[in-house]
């Protein structure tokens, strides 16, 4: 059985929660063959993997969203295809309509090999653009509007024209571009389609666009509408849609996902991983707080640094460890380094990428100040090491800290996001009471053991994979997958397989 995992902007290039989940999932099923379709910004990222690929991953195929020279993994026909009335209405529905004719669009790009550049520069797209302009944007310069509209549909076109992997099951780690690629591949080859959302993609993009400086205000609603249409395509065409917690499932329903397709599947971690890690040095007077995060804006590291600055003034024993890579957004990371220098604050350590086993035992508590999360693996990993956590009230952090249907008690402290004062208060409080830290750590350990074990996640996804395989009459392999000789060492990159 071959599973094609489809991920945008994460595995196997970026270290983080979603990437760790994907890597763990592949490792849980050595009997299955996996291919990875990786959606990335451009070919400059090609092949720069942050993970060593497991032996049952036989292919990595890349889709570049910002590469005007890329042709989707195949050579395009040189002729100009004139749209039929049905095809024109399908493309119009993508831009204007509420209900998109995705099947006609898929056929247009895959079977008729529509030239994306010629379409965007041609009369059919111009006619659609003029209609949108007259309906909604008549007060702005038309040429600016036209080029903005082209820029919106260019990355979607790259996703639609790519040459998909043939597989029995397409497993998308989000909606958005991943969901479109999975929907297209499922339509083309008949494989089952599974969507597993860690955060709710549409809401995350909406928040990002509202705050973004690169999107002019007048176009923000249009961008948001397009992401909603893309997500709705995935919801409607999927065989099953999973979420990590009940509130996320409710958001999926609000965004149009059919209720009967939804299922809650919590994350899982190996609770034995940190059983024998080294602890604090005897007599160490410091209170070590660890943030196992990527140094990126979504983790709100600047708020963390500012909060620590004020907490440190109240308790000199505090020491902050920011444990994770900073290469993803070097400009933001540099701003964080400069903020530490400007505050003249002591005892903040940036470690870069680490092995958690070497650090987590030395921590008294963990902290997560994100402005957006799903169900953070780092909190669950901390619980498995009996470490309490300070977390912002985003995603499922409340459920993890305070519990959902259990009486284990609080496993940390919850704060509002972007609230320097409250986060500083939480650091001081957790430093002040060692007995409370121990109680919280034990509560977290009991919580992770009861509901968030990797064995439970494996069992859940084994049942889902078997259910979808059976529906497509695909036999379930019991033995470990062994690559064919020609596949040994043959991890490919989509841009190289034209």
Please tell me what each predicted stretch does.
Residues 253, 259, 269-285, 471:
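Acidic anion/phosphate-binding donor-loop and adjacent secondary structure
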Residues 319-334:
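Glycosyltransferase donor-sugar binding loop
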Residues 247, 268:
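Carbohydrate-associated surface elements
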Residues 333-353:
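Nucleotide-activated donor-binding/catalytic signature segment of Leloir-type glycosyltransferases, i.e.
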Residues 404-420, 429-434:
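Conserved acidic donor-binding segment of nucleotide-sugar-dependent glycosyltransferases
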Residues 388-391, 395-402:
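Short hydrophobic beta-strand element within catalytic cores of glycosyltransferases
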Residues 371:
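Aromatic "clamp/platform" in nucleotide-sugar-dependent glycosyltransferases that forms part
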Residues 278-310, 320-323:
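Conserved donor-binding/catalytic core segment of Leloir-type glycosyltransferases
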